[in-house]
Amino acid sequence: MELIPNLSIETWVLLAISLVLIYIYGTYSHGTFKKLGIPGPKPLPFFGTILGYHDGTWKFDETCYKKYGKIWGFYDGRVPVLAIADPEIIKTVLVKECYSNFTNRRSFGPVGFMKKSITISKDEEWKRLRTLLSPAFTSGKLKEMFPIIGQYGDTLVKNLRREEEKGKPVNMKEILGAYSMDVITGTSFGVNVDSLNNPEDPFVQKARKILKFNFFDPFILSIILFPFLTTIYDLLRFSIFPRQSTNFFKKFITTMKKNRLHSNQKTRMDFFQLMMNTQNSKGKESQKALSDLEMAAQAIIFIFAGYESTSTSICLVLYELATHPDVQKKLHDEIDSALPNKAPVTYDVLMGMEYLDMVINEGLRLYPIANRLERISKKAVEINGLFIPKGITVMVPTYPLHRDPEYWPEPEEFRPERFSKENKGSIDPYVYMPFGNGPRNCIGMRFALLSMKLAVVSVLQNFTLQTCEQTENHLKFARQIILQPENPIILKIISRDKPITGA
């Protein structure tokens, strides 16, 4: 049997040309940074440098930061991405030229009607949504909403007390994931779901399906390797957001809106109601009101963007408190002083706790959940001698910036005092960006901080946290787009009504 097929010369030529064209297609953009004189890891055909994500994007960025400095280039498949860690250039990208050039984030696959969400929308549509939604996230509105959020803090304590009475270490992500889910669904959809004790509730199940996003999923990988497939997937009505879940929430929004419009009960002040309030006659005339579909998109994106980030951040802060008893004691003292005899938590008292704020900020520095900020350059531009071509994706790597010893002495140490009144003013806002920066920063920043602070105070008001045999001494992080522990954080919790024994 012949190993080489007996083909005509013409066939061999066509085959060779085809292979060359395929190779060119898979590599044609891979010379972008070499031409610009920008260093970076060597790309592979089609894959670019994404195989470097095997330990997580945060680790890839940290490695590149140490090797190449404050500017480097890499490739997500065939897409060139310019990493910028220079504070002055970051300021220009995120703030100074946000409206004129760096307005939009990267399009990432087919998203269906979710393109109407504030996170994914572009240009004038984004500006319109930001204008409509920003009033819902002011301090005043959050204070009005606090009684709703506060009840989930009570549920959190009840769930923890039930676990504590079992006398076993607690999986903190399980408990705090339920808290985060309840807060977001309660404020975005106006429903009370005790998700820890009702895991089979269809609302909880549909929400959790939205959260299953894996960079190495074959569907996602196909989009990275062959971007043209996005157009085909759009025509086929495929989406990175599961249709079963998005359809469920669309129907739910319509039903909930009808119920509220025809209800004689006092209006519940939550994000859902605030979105409904844009649909007044004046808003309709000016075409500024949110449509029902846009309301659904915002509510879904709140789950997608808020659940994992908030619950993981709280877990990591509590982990640091358990491993730093001196910090925990100091925070216990502040809580006991501000809320004597376990007084109910109020918005004003919560926001006035200085040491709590320091602890939360330091936790977000060590563990920036959104470890990348991205913008697209709409036109060719030069910033501080750096030429940025039109259409290039610009990425700010927050993880290595948050741990750079140039800005943070002994960066691996958990030191809330970095964010004291005396020190906070000296922190460059472009090397500390847990919620991004500029006009397109995280719109839910105040809400996320409020949720985190309420959870931490609710826990520490009632419990002391300790490490146990199952607690990892050095956390390992998963191969995910966002920063999250590979294994659950397990802690021992002790009621403060009981005497504390050794760990």
Curated annotation (Swiss-Prot):
Disulfide bonds: none annotated. Keywords: Endoplasmic reticulum, Heme, Iron, Membrane, Metal-binding, Microsome, Monooxygenase, Oxidoreductase. It is found in: Endoplasmic reticulum membrane; Microsome membrane. GO terms for cellular component: endoplasmic reticulum membrane. The keyword Metal-binding applies. It is a peripheral membrane protein. Heme binds at C442. It catalyses: lithocholate + reduced [NADPH--hemoprotein reductase] + O2 = 6beta-hydroxylithocholate + oxidized [NADPH--hemoprotein reductase] + H2O + H(+). PROSITE patterns: CYTOCHROME_P450. Its EC number is 1.14.14.138. InterPro entries: Cyt_P450, Cyt_P450_CS, Cyt_P450_E_CYP3A, Cyt_P450_E_grp-II, Cyt_P450_sf, Cytochrome_P450_3A. Pfam families: p450. Its cofactor is heme. It is an enzyme of class 1 (oxidoreductase). Induction: P450 can be induced to high levels in liver and other tissues by various foreign compounds, including drugs, pesticides, and carcinogens. Its main location: endoplasmic reticulum. GO terms for biological process: oxidative demethylation; steroid metabolic process. It comes from the Eukaryota. GO terms for molecular function: heme binding; iron ion binding; lithocholate 6beta-hydroxylase activity; oxidoreductase activity, acting on paired donors, with incorporation or reduction of molecular oxygen, reduced flavin or flavoprotein as one donor, and incorporation of one atom of oxygen; testosterone 6-beta-hydroxylase activity. Belongs to the cytochrome P450 family. Catalyzes the 6 beta-hydroxylation of lithocholic acid and steroid hormones. This is Lithocholate 6-beta-hydroxylase. The lineage of its organism: Eukaryota, Metazoa, Chordata, Craniata, Vertebrata.
